[in-house]
């Protein structure tokens, strides 16, 4: 890689790192300190934002500090970086499940997603990656032979690939397709009901509009976040597959592209919250002290 390319990559990585930290930090601030954002759905957003915040804070800085091979230790990498990448994956899956329940079983949502269950689910989404990151310590500092340690790493890498790589890439698209089909069916049923009301009671619809915008924005958000994740993590999963089944190190261009996409994913999620969640957009505009009504109109025109 030429000098100018390396310089550009480093600068671009730092820009994405700063964007991920600032953007997710702002999301964390809004959910914690804005009472109107204290809802069950936003707790999952908060948990994902915390994971993405630490992805931004650790991913590239660790690469720069431990660029040389003697500094790099796989178990330290898991404790410092991969734990937050895995937490980002588990929290995204959890948020998808939450939206799936809200759309598939809207009448039972409040009884299913109680405060206790929500907190337990968020704790599980963090505890599983933490336990995973601690597992390598059990053989790294043990008296087992180097051959057994190598086998342990192979099994561990394969298992984490299945849990945090393959499974989300199968589960998330299926969940999104199911959500979109249900939303489409509900919109068709709503249109049929409104058409019947228009036919039976002229003028009623003008006075009593159904407002599906909240449901639509919620659906758009989860679809956008999941699609962004799938696009940005496909290189990372491919690199992990190559490390498990291949015998050659992936090209440097693939590794650079993978790291850039991972940071883009963490930096883009706050943008999606601000543009597609009306409550976030409203509180963000208040925080930035922008006139709410005029700014809302401007953003709606852009969207």
Residue positions per predicted region:
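Helix-boundary and loop/linker segments of multi-pass membrane transporters
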Residues: 1-6, 33-38, 110-114, 149-155, ...
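Extracellular TM2-ECL1-early TM3 structural module of rhodopsin-like
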Residues: 2-18, 40-112, 154
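Helix-to-loop junction signature of class
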Residues: 13-17, 30, 54-69, 81, ...
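Alpha-helical transmembrane segments of multi-pass membrane proteins
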Residues: 17-20, 46-56, 86, 117-134, ...
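Transmembrane helix-loop junctions in multipass membrane proteins, especially transporters and channels
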Residues: 32-36, 64-72, 107-110, 137-145, ...
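Intracellular effector-coupling site of seven-transmembrane GPCRs
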Residues: 50-51, 181-236
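Fourth transmembrane helix
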Residues: 65, 84-94, 101, 105-148, ...
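Seventh transmembrane helix
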Residues: 168-175, 220, 225, 230-241, ...
């Amino acid at each position: 890689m030429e000098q100018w390319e390396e310089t550009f990559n480093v600068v671009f990585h730092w820009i994405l790192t700063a964007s991920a930290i600032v953007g997710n930090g702002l999301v964390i601030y809004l959910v914690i300190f804005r009472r109107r954002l204290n809802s069950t759905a936003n707790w999952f957003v908060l948990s994902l934002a915390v994971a993405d915040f630490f992805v931004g804070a650790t991913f590239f800085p660790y690469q720069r500090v431990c660029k040389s091979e003697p500094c790099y230790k796989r178990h330290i990498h898991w404790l410092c970086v991969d734990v937050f990448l895995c937490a980002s994956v588990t929290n995204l899956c959890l948020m998808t499940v939450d939206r799936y329940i809200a759309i598939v079983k809207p009448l039972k949502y409040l009884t299913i997603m109680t405060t206790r269950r929500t907190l337990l689910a968020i704790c599980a989404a963090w505890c599983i990656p933490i336990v995973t990151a601690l597992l390598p310590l059990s053989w790294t500092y043990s008296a087992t032979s180097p051959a057994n340690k190598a086998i342990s790493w192979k099994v561990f890498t394969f298992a984490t690939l299945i849990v945090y790589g393959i499974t989300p890439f199968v589960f998330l698209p299926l969940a999104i397709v199911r959500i979109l089909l249900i939303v489409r069916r509900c919109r068709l049923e709503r249109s049929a009901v409104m058409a019947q009301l228009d036919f039976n009671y002229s003028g009623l619809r003008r006075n009593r509009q159904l407002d599906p915008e909240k449901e639509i924005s919620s659906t758009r958000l989860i679809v956008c976040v999941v699609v962004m994740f799938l696009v940005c993590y496909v290189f990372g999963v491919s690199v992990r597959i190559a490390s498990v089944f291949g015998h050659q190190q992936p090209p440097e261009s693939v590794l650079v592209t993978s790291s850039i996409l991972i940071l883009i994913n963490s930096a883009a999620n706050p943008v999606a919250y601000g543009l597609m969640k009306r409550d976030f957009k409203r509180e963000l505009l208040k925080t930035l002290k922008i006139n709410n009504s005029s700014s809302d109109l401007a953003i709606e025109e852009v969207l």
